C-alpha cells in the first residue's frame, strides 16, 4: 500500500479517536450513531489491514468504555463477537490464520454450559471469551509488525485514557463520590479497573523500550511518554491494586533482565523515587480518601470477604455446585450476608464455575509460559505477573471485561512468536 493511503488511514483513525476523547455527553448516543461509528471504525482496517483489527478494537473499545462520558462503543459485550466474526470474512483473502488455543475453547464451552443451566441465558463473560477466541484467529505469530502494532495501540490506549482522566479529574471525583449514581461506565466509576487498564499500556511501553528492533526515536518517545503520563494518572486514580501490580511487574522485568547491576539499580531507584514524589505530592486526594476508609476494618475487609465466600462455597450447595459453581455472578450472592463484591477473580471463578472452572483458568494463565521460548519467557512472565496481580484485587475475567481479555491476547501474541530480539 502506498504512503498516501497509509497517511490517509492514520489521519482517519486519529480523527475517530479524537471524536471519542472529546465527548462529554452523559447521555448515550442514539443507536444509529453507534452503528454508523462502529462500521466506520471497522471497515477500513478490515479491508486493508485485517491482521491489525484485534489491536485496534481492544484499544479503541477500552478508551470508549473507560470514558467518563457515553461514547459510541457499546458497553454490552454481546456486540463484540458479532464484530469480530464479521471481520473474519475479510481474512479469507489471507492464507495466514491461526487456530484458537484449545484451552480457550474448552473454558468457553464450560462457561456457556454452566450459565445456561444456572441462569437460562448467555452471559457477558461468555461473550468476552467468544470475542477473544475469534480475535485470536487474526493473529499471525510470525509477523513482527503485528506485535509492534499491538504494543503501539496499547500505548495509545493508555495515553488516551490518561489524557481523558487528567483533563476531567473533577468529573471523576463527582461520579466516584455518588455511590447511588448508577453509572453504567463501571471502568470509569471504579478507579481500580481504570488504573489497571492504564497499567496495561505501561507494561506494553516497557516492552517497546526493551526491544532492539524498535529502538528508533519515535518508539522511544512513545514509550517514555506512555510511562511518565500514565504513571502520573495511575497515582491520581488512587488504585492501590493497580500500582502494586505495576510495581511488581516492572520490578520482575528489571530484576530478571540481562542488563548490568548498575543499570538495574538506577532504573529501580528512578521508579521508586518518581513514585514517592507523586505519592507525596498535592494531587492524591482520592488516594488519601480511600486509604482513610480502611481504618474502619483495619484494611482486612477484602480478606474477610474472601474467607466468607470460600466458607460458603465449600460448606453449601450440591456436588454440581462444587464442580461447576453457581453460574455468572453466583459468587456475589453466595452466603447469607447479602450482596458482596469479591475483589478476587480466583475466588469469583471458583464460586461461579467451580473447581473445574478455576482449574481451567489457572491452566489458561499458565498456557503462555508453556508455549513460549526461553528468550521471550521473562517478558511473558512479567506481563502475566501484572495480569495475575490485577486478578487478585479485581474480577476482570469473571465479570467479562474485554480490555483484560485483549491484554491476554497480547501476551499470547508475544508468547507464540519467535525471538523478539529483546535486550533482556
Predicted regions and their residues:
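Alpha-helical transmembrane segments of multi-pass inner-membrane proteins
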Residues: 109-113, 148-175, 189-256, 363
